[in-house]
Amino acid sequence: MERIKELRNLMSQSRTREILTKTTVDHMAIIKKYTSGRQEKNPSLRMKWMMAMKYPITADKRITEMIPERNEQGQTLWSKMNDAGSDRVMVSPLAVTWWNRNGPMTSTVHYPKIYKTYFEKVERLKHGTFGPVHFRNQVKIRRRVDINPGHADLSAKEAQDVIMEVVFPNEVGARILTSESQLTITKEKKEELQDCKISPLMVAYMLERELVRKTRFLPVAGGTSSVYIEVLHLTQGTCWEQMYTPGGEVRNDDVDQSLIIAARNIVRRAAVSADPLASLLEMCHSTQIGGTRMVDILRQNPTEEQAVDICKAAMGLRISSSFSFGGFTFKRTSGSSVKREEEVLTGNLQTLKIRVHEGYEEFTMVGRRATAILRKATRRLIQLIVSGKDEQSIAEAIIVAMVFSQEDCMIKAVRGDLNFVNRANQRLNPMHQLLRHFQKDAKVLFQNWGIEPIDNVMGMIGILPDMTPSTEVSMRGVRVSKMGVDEYSNAERVVVSIDRFLRVRDQRGNVLLSPEEVSETQGTEKLTITYSSSMMWEINGPESVLVNTYQWIIRNWETVKIQWSQNPTMLYNKMEFEPFQSLVPKAIRGQYSGFVRTLFQQMRDVLGTFDTTQIIKLLPFAAAPPKQSRMQFSSLTVNVRGSGMRILVRGNSPVFNYNKATKRLTVLGKDAGTLTEDPDEGTSGVESAVLRGFLILGKEDRRYGPALSINELSNLAKGEKANVLIGQGDVVLVMKRKRDSSILTDSQTATKRIRMAIN
């Protein structure tokens, strides 16, 4: 009270009032605050104050020759006074207006090219649609998101080299442009920027935006692709959201989306093959996404998704150290544990061997639609705080956490036997067995978990076994929060190892990922995915398998033909025939195979019964393990279009139709390619194929030594002669050609000459 009286007293004196209102602020702390450092402390005030002056802008002296002293209205555009402390002229904002209206015109052709990302953004916004605003609580979680739509995926170093090469081509300095994308971009940009007058620095900045992915760790409640992030400030606030549909897509989002789909398809397919790791690598190396090799995309693209990370691990790339379970990404935030094998009994008295984590640990769990914080001890859930989009998502998170806790009451809640298998028909490991069981039905789990009274804590409520909220009681240790749990921000990558069955482990041996964690969600890729590997033929169904198998035979006919005659077993075992087997009815596969192999052997034995079209048509059937039987077939059945269709052993059918006139093969009405040689040389024995590059001189000539087998021919030098054993034990004299150019005619002439030589 005393102080206030004193102040009132002071203020009543007019001198005090005058001192306080009129004197300049010269308090040292305040002066320090506003003058130390180069950083502007109150930018908007500074701007307003500057623009209120007559000449707030400075310009190079040359401007006085380019702009009149006054405009049409007689207002002064620049001052005759020099700017203090520099030899520049002080200029009025009106000069900018004059320059924009009357200044020199330059070519604008380069602007859309340089400021491409901005022009495209305007287009996207122009065509985007904004929907209604909804007021509701926003569960935002911080995620690492791409903030720069329309970029390529070069590393900072690669981009730097490209920019230097494009903007400063004559500067000295080692620049090595190695990757295909670097070379393509450099060539493209150099052409675009010929005679460009925009300042090199600006061009460099804009190129950087175009070439490098920029990520930020931002709170997001909705879509995370870059075309949504660029309008984040328009679509979600603290308590509101606005619906928005982007007015265009950008390649980087499409690449991310298509990469995930390709990786999932490949991991799922590899998991069921004989050697999953080898198959996965073969598929990654032979797949293209939007015309770019998948392995190149994997090296550059930072997308973190289970299947993508398995592919990266297989290629020896580093991945995030978090691990995946039940579709949630777990990151340990504190504590530690040791692992120990333990046998437990389910409610059905089935014995499970589980790896128990002993020790206290805390985790964040992040999924697509729910997030949680989990605190656990050895086989005990201490606390789980969940937040999610809806009841369903929250339930998913709770099930995963309860299974992960390895609590006894969870294991005892199992009703019935656990016998879930993966795509390759192998039993899942016990933890995934439990997970699948409760994902199907968690009623018993939730009922048996136990209930506790709860304290009233801000922002948290309880949840009952039937997933209804409550402020009084909750399932033991479980609470629902309004706030989301942030994704783990650290972008550190670790070295991992991967085993034959695609299980990815960190260096301490903890399993981070396995094929069980790969989502079964199917989507349609935005960019064309081209799987060249035969293992992926079945992705588009039985018809595609049929067409692809025959296309492959025709494309590789030259080598297939030689293998057919010299090493049929190796040919039958080729992986390209694997997918085809699923089309042949299981019960009769072996008989078909035995029948076709016998038929082929007769063709090899009896000269002149060789029929190209027939070999191509029947070859895939010979790939199954053969059963010896006396059965003869006039047609073979394949299961396509939902029913059995017939392939005729002799002649055409809707499934396999060869047009002699055009030499085109159509399979189920789809073009399967053209045969380069004429199969109607019906009798052109396989010898003709094998004897390409050799001239048949006539009957055997003893002077040239004992008869060689067809396989031994390859050792002859050009121009050398030898006797060779063909077909049914006949021997002819041949000479290895000196020139390769005439090889093509050999097939046709060989047949006729063999006949002449033998007769």
Curated annotation (Swiss-Prot):
Q: Where is the major localization of this protein?
A: virion
> Hey, where's the site called Mammalian adaptation on this chain?
K627
Q: GO CC terms on record?
A: host cell mitochondrion; host cell nucleus; virion component
- Report the locations given in the UniProt record: Virion; Host nucleus; Host mitochondrion
Key word Ribosomal protein present? no
Q: What domain of life is recorded for the organism? A: Viruses
Q: Which InterPro entries match?
A: Flu_PB2_2nd, Flu_PB2_6th, Flu_PB2_C, Flu_PB2_CAP-bd, Flu_PB2_middle, Flu_PB2_N, INV_PB2, PB2_helical
Q: Which UniProt keywords apply?
A: Cap snatching, Eukaryotic host gene expression shutoff by virus, Eukaryotic host transcription shutoff by virus, Host gene expression shutoff by virus, Host mitochondrion, Host nucleus, Host-virus interaction, Inhibition of host innate immune response by virus, Inhibition of host MAVS by virus, Inhibition of host RLR pathway by virus, Inhibition of host RNA polymerase II by virus, mRNA capping, mRNA processing, Viral immunoevasion, Viral transcription, Virion
Question: Where, by residue number, is the motif Nuclear localization signal?
Answer: 736-739
GO biological process annotation, one example: viral RNA genome replication
Record has Transmembrane helix as a keyword? no
GO MF term set: RNA binding; RNA-directed RNA polymerase activity
Which family is this sequence assigned to? Belongs to the influenza viruses PB2 family.
Q: Which HAMAP family match?
A: INV_PB2 (MF_04062)
Subunit annotation = Influenza RNA polymerase is composed of three subunits: PB1, PB2 and PA. Interacts (via N-terminus) with PB1 (via C-terminus). Interacts with nucleoprotein NP (via N-terminus). Interacts (via N-terminus) with host MAVS (via N-terminus); this interaction inhibits host innate immune response.
Q: What does this protein do?
A: Plays an essential role in transcription initiation and cap-stealing mechanism, in which cellular capped pre-mRNAs are used to generate primers for viral transcription. Recognizes and binds the 7-methylguanosine-containing cap of the target pre-RNA which is subsequently cleaved after 10-13 nucleotides by the viral protein PA. Plays a role in the initiation of the viral genome replication and modulates the activity of the ribonucleoprotein (RNP) complex.
| Protein name listed in UniProt | Polymerase basic protein 2
Species assigned in the record: Influenza A virus (strain A/USA:Iowa/1943 H1N1)
